[in-house]
């Protein structure tokens, strides 16, 4: 008790004073019924295919395709994490501006994947170049590697397009 007989009010409980998370996408399985959820699923599918195809070509040009592998593997796992946070409903428990985080994530990955797509297409275009081993010209990419890299380039483009669509949807949610 204080000097005047009045009691001091208890300090506010910090758990009660947290603001509500800002997210306009639904949490739980309902995320899969939205365009954004469908695009994230396509990003995971196509990104996984890029990863598998580049790895199966034995990475004949590591300087170019190393970045493609890094981007595809990293984006694959972060997209899985992103989808997992929404499917589990954790986005409603974590105080963050999820609309901005969605935009920032998709912008970053779109820029990186666009660069990866260009590098993969550049690696594929080197099919007709030859290098000299003991006076015999050997192609940089054999026909099997070329075919795999063509498929990887196509899926890298499709993945980039999916990230671009997700970026557009995220921008609409973030900037009403």
Curated annotation (Swiss-Prot):
Domain MARVEL: 31-175
Residues exposed to the Cytoplasmic side: 1-34, 88-102, 171-176
One cellular component term from this protein's GO annotations in UniProt: apical plasma membrane
GO MF term list: structural constituent of myelin sheath
Glycosylation (residues): 132
Lumenal membrane side: 56-66, 124-149
BP terms from Gene Ontology: myelination
Annotated keywords: Cell membrane, Glycoprotein, Membrane, Transmembrane, Transmembrane helix
Bilayer disposition of the protein: Multi-pass membrane protein
Subcellular location: Cell membrane; Apical cell membrane
Residue spans crossing the bilayer: 35-55, 67-87, 103-123, 150-170
PANTHER family, per the entry: MARVEL-CONTAINING POTENTIAL LIPID RAFT-ASSOCIATED PROTEIN, PROTEIN MAL2
Record note on quaternary structure: Interacts with TPD52L2.
Function statement: Member of the machinery of polarized transport. Required for the indirect transcytotic route at the step of the egress of the transcytosing cargo from perinuclear endosomes in order for it to travel to the apical surface via a raft-dependent pathway.
Family per record: Belongs to the MAL family.
Protein name: Protein MAL2
Originating species: Pongo abelii (Sumatran orangutan)
Phylogenetic lineage: Eukaryota, Metazoa, Chordata, Craniata, Vertebrata
């Amino acid at each position: 008790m204080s000097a005047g007989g009045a009691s001091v009010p208890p300090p506010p409980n910090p758990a009660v004073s947290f603001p509500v998370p800002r997210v306009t996408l639904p949490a739980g399985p309902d995320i899969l019924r939205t365009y954004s959820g469908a695009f994230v699923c396509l990003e995971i599918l196509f990104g996984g295919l890029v990863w598998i195809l580049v790895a199966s070509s034995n990475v004949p040009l590591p300087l170019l395709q190393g970045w493609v592998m890094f981007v595809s593997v990293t984006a694959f796992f972060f997209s899985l994490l992103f989808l997992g946070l929404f499917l589990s409903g954790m986005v409603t428990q974590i105080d963050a501006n999820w609309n901005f985080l969605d935009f920032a994530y998709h912008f970053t990955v779109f820029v990186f994947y666009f660069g990866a797509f260009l590098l993969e297409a550049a690696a594929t275009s080197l099919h007709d170049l030859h290098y000299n081993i003991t006076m015999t010209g050997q192609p940089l990419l054999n026909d099997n590697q070329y075919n795999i890299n063509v498929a990887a380039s196509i899926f890298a483009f499709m993945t980039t397009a999916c990230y671009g669509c997700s970026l557009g949807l995220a921008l609409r949610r973030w900037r009403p």
